[in-house]
């Protein structure tokens, strides 16, 4: 079985299924530090990454941007001094798809190698 951080995103259309209530616990177990947030009735995955300064936060933001471009799946990114908030959800289905969990796991992999983490 492929782990989330090794998986690749699949094309997600408006008729793609959202992650089911039955799938949710197992997927969350694989990304334990991520939180579910609900905004405008849309379930999203969110995590805050802390850095020693803005330079390292920006470098991490750019690294996440690179994996997002490579997979064709893009997060919400809020870059602040010493902090980056990453939010994954699937716009086309207005909720969570397996792709979001894949990208959250891949974001964690990027964070492991990021310089300047607190």
UniProtKB/Swiss-Prot annotation:
EC number: 4.2.1.96
GO MF annotations, alphabetized: 4-alpha-hydroxytetrahydrobiopterin dehydratase activity
PANTHER family: PTERIN-4-ALPHA-CARBINOLAMINE DEHYDRATASE-RELATED
SUPFAM superfamilies tied to this protein: PCD-like
Pfam families cross-referenced by the UniProt entry: Pterin_4a
Protein family according to the UniProt entry: Belongs to the pterin-4-alpha-carbinolamine dehydratase family.
Reaction catalysis annotation: (4aS,6R)-4a-hydroxy-L-erythro-5,6,7,8-tetrahydrobiopterin = (6R)-L-erythro-6,7-dihydrobiopterin + H2O
Name of the protein in question: Putative pterin-4-alpha-carbinolamine dehydratase
Record-linked Gene3D superfamilies: Transcriptional coactivator/pterin dehydratase (3.30.1360.20)
Entries under InterPro entries matching the protein: PCD_sf (IPR036428), Pterin-4-alpha-carb_dehyd (IPR050376), Pterin_deHydtase (IPR001533)
Single biological process term from Gene Ontology: tetrahydrobiopterin biosynthetic process
Keywords, sorted A to Z: Lyase
């Amino acid at each position: 079985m492929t782990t989330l951080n090794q998986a690749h995103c699949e094309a997600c259309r408006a008729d793609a299924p959202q992650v089911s209530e039955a799938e949710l616990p197992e997927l969350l177990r694989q990304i334990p530090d991520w939180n579910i947030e609900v905004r405008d009735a849309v379930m999203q995955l969110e995590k805050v990454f802390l850095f020693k300064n803005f330079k390292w936060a920006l470098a991490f933001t750019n690294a996440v941007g690179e994996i997002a471009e490579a997979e064709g799946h893009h997060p919400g990114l809020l870059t602040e001094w010493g902090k980056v908030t990453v939010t994954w959800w699937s716009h086309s289905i207005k909720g969570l798809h397996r792709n979001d969990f894949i990208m959250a796991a891949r974001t964690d992999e990027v964070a492991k190698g990021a310089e300047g983490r607190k």
